[in-house]
């Protein structure tokens, strides 16, 4: 064989070898990329599952808190209502004592005693729940008093409260009902 042919064959074998090496490298890169894609897809799927679980937990918590909020609103006055049962019981006892065979003076005394006890129970219950009476001593305050009439009074200055006609009440710092008062001219 001639030198030229040998060189040609050698060159062709070198090219084929280089192509085989490139093909092997490409196959290895392809396998490496496929593994990487598979790993990334797996990580993505895992992240999606974690997100869906976290979102479901969030939604469940949101529903639970909403339910608890409505229950708190529905039963907010439960303690107050239970505390009102004592004055109610006192009134019922006073009425039952009126049915007993006693003379009128004794009956009147028992009813008066029952009403006083009931009033005391109401006041105690109100204080327990931060319900206080609006003060009506001194100057008229339009924020907590409602002037229903003006009267002449030698003992009071103009604008001072002369008489409380109906008590007013405050729950903590919120006015439940203003006091109905008469004020001096």
Curated annotation (Swiss-Prot):
Q: Which UniProt keywords apply?
A: Chaperone, Cytoplasm, Stress response
An example of a GO molecular function for this protein is: protein-folding chaperone binding
One of the GO biological process terms:
protein folding
Pfam families membership: GrpE
The ranges of region (Disordered) come to 1-40
Supply the PROSITE patterns for this chain: GRPE (PS01071)
Q: Which Gene3D superfamilies match?
A: 3.90.20.20, Head domain of nucleotide exchange factor GrpE
Against InterPro entries, the record matches this protein to: GrpE, GrpE_coiled_coil, GrpE_head
Extract one GO cellular component term from the record: cytosol
The compartments listed are: Cytoplasm
Q: What is its main location?
A: cytoplasm
Question: What is the documented function of this protein?
Answer: Participates actively in the response to hyperosmotic and heat shock by preventing the aggregation of stress-denatured proteins, in association with DnaK and GrpE. It is the nucleotide exchange factor for DnaK and may function as a thermosensor. Unfolded proteins bind initially to DnaJ; upon interaction with the DnaJ-bound protein, DnaK hydrolyzes its bound ATP, resulting in the formation of a stable complex. GrpE releases ADP from DnaK; ATP binding to DnaK triggers the release of the substrate protein, thus completing the reaction cycle.
Show the NCBIfam families listed in the entry.
PRK14140.1 (NF010738), PRK14149.1 (NF010747)
Instruction: Spell out the family assignment given in the record's similarity comment.
Output: Belongs to the GrpE family.
HAMAP family (UniProt xref): GrpE
Self-association or partners: how does it assemble? Homodimer.
State the name under which the record lists this protein.
Answer: Protein GrpE
Source organism per UniProt: Aliarcobacter butzleri (strain RM4018)
